[in-house]
Amino acid sequence: MAKEELIQFEGLVTEILPDARYRVQLDAGHEIVAYTAGKMKKNRIKTLAGDRVTIEMSPYDLEKGRLIFRHKDERPGGPPRSGPPRGGQFRRR
């Protein structure tokens, strides 16, 4: 199937399921099961319950989808996320 035939929806992750799957509530009101796309796994992008995501679906099976994008946090007033310390205090002499 060509990529031109896939359709995209936006939604909210409501539940994390086993085997790297997620239950997603679409903006249209439907609830589907989605799995993480390979590029997201490769780049170690974590998805948590409550995240806004973009889902790619086949028009032939509207019950399953592929999670292709996690939108950045849009929570007002929250501090920006910072990664773990890089270990700069220990240097080789």
Swiss-Prot record:
One Pfam family named in its UniProt record: eIF-1a
Region of interest: Disordered: 70-93
GO MF term list: ribosome binding; rRNA binding; translation initiation factor activity
The S1-like domain, residue ranges: 1-72
Localization of this protein: Cytoplasm
GO cellular component: a single term: cytosol
Assigned keywords, A-Z: Cytoplasm, Initiation factor, Protein biosynthesis, RNA-binding, rRNA-binding
Subunit structure: Component of the 30S ribosomal translation pre-initiation complex which assembles on the 30S ribosome in the order IF-2 and IF-3, IF-1 and N-formylmethionyl-tRNA(fMet); mRNA recruitment can occur at any time during PIC assembly.
Function: One of the essential components for the initiation of protein synthesis. Stabilizes the binding of IF-2 and IF-3 on the 30S subunit to which N-formylmethionyl-tRNA(fMet) subsequently binds. Helps modulate mRNA selection, yielding the 30S pre-initiation complex (PIC). Upon addition of the 50S ribosomal subunit IF-1, IF-2 and IF-3 are released leaving the mature 70S translation initiation complex.
Assigned protein family: Belongs to the IF-1 family.
Protein name: Translation initiation factor IF-1
Lineage: Bacteria, Pseudomonadati, Pseudomonadota, Alphaproteobacteria, Hyphomicrobiales
